[in-house]
């Protein structure tokens, strides 16, 4: 018996182990016929590769710096039939067979894009509603932190089920699209609630739900005529991503030898007098230490990111993408990414977070910009941060010849800088800024005026969750968490619920009814 066990163990030891395959599957009939498949497993880099599937040819095997990856490039002919191909690996007699599915595109509706006829409702899932308390902790998360609603920067337990449970509420409000803050895995020891430090680009964080639940959420939104905009981050990953400890290529991250923080000076990207040092610090510097900066100049990384976005569009039928920290990533790489998305999905829309305090800075980033002489970003939509900066004082204060609403007039008078002013995402607040209301107002006159302006002026308006019930707060009084507070009634044990008229104060009800009529 001992000899049998030993023999079986020896056979097992000879097998190659592949523990991760990205993308997990793909489709036939895509516009770009080249597919990159990234394999990960101990010492698989130098394995010979063989594939025999009608219509599929292995064009290239890229063996990176790490011994634990392979990048396989396949060409899929237009007449390739759906099915499962087998990728055979052989390293000196140690073998592995990796099944890989090529699906048929299902043709379901969705991936529709969004435009100025839409109104986006921005949700931070962790703070909106906890529909499934059983997933607040998950064994697959190594760096799990406890749910504690008393701590602003802790997880509070909101999830996809919570958003699903309140879709009728969102629908009745009258918005036509939901922008969801990041829901991909964030296996990080701190701050994971906000989702901006991705540790797996193909997996919904299990504390939010599953890939299947996300797909169901999108389907249910579409059934109600509501679009879904997915938040993505290509500038950086989280330091908890397996890439950080086992980098496929030495240049997978910028400043690979250690943490160098960005200078946050986006003006360097269009400054005619900029030094190479300052510009490099802006683009290649890390956003924070827990978010190492990805190097989009590495062609294999860029191909990975492009395919990742296409995979989510095709598998979930999301209608748009909001790209975080867009200008901090490589200009040419991101322009190529957008071109590839538009090639596959003509009429799609992507909005980039281009956080400038000037109209010229924002206009630099819009597709076919009049002021960008360095290249075409291809970015259809930019965000109107100038409006959010000027809005509160303009609407709440006095207006004279130079201030108040004249600031808004002067802002709009500069729309000639933009090739498409209708493709500007307009907002008065979001998850990164102070709430439009720093505290609950004594009267709603100026608040109503601001809502009317937002929803009737040029651009694509966005409303932050809770605006309709006068949620308020400033970052100065408690950091980011103070402007990302829980939606009352979305969590077990809440004593009141603003999801129903009976749970709202008279002033909240007045605001809710007014905004609903506008929408």
Regions found by a protein language model. Give the residues of each.
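Hydrophobic faces of well-ordered beta-strands that scaffold small-molecule active sites
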Residues: 119-121, 178-180, 228-230, 321, ...
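Edge beta-strands of extracellular beta-sandwich domains
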Residues: 95-103
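Low-complexity, Pro/Ser/Thr- and charge-rich linker/hinge segments at domain boundaries
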Residues: 102-122, 127-132
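Bacterial Sec-dependent N-terminal signal peptides
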Residues: 1-19
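Beta-strand/beta-sandwich contexts
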Residues: 13-45, 102-106, 111
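Active-site-proximal helices and loops of the catalytic beta/alpha 8
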Residues: 218, 236, 241-244, 308-310, ...
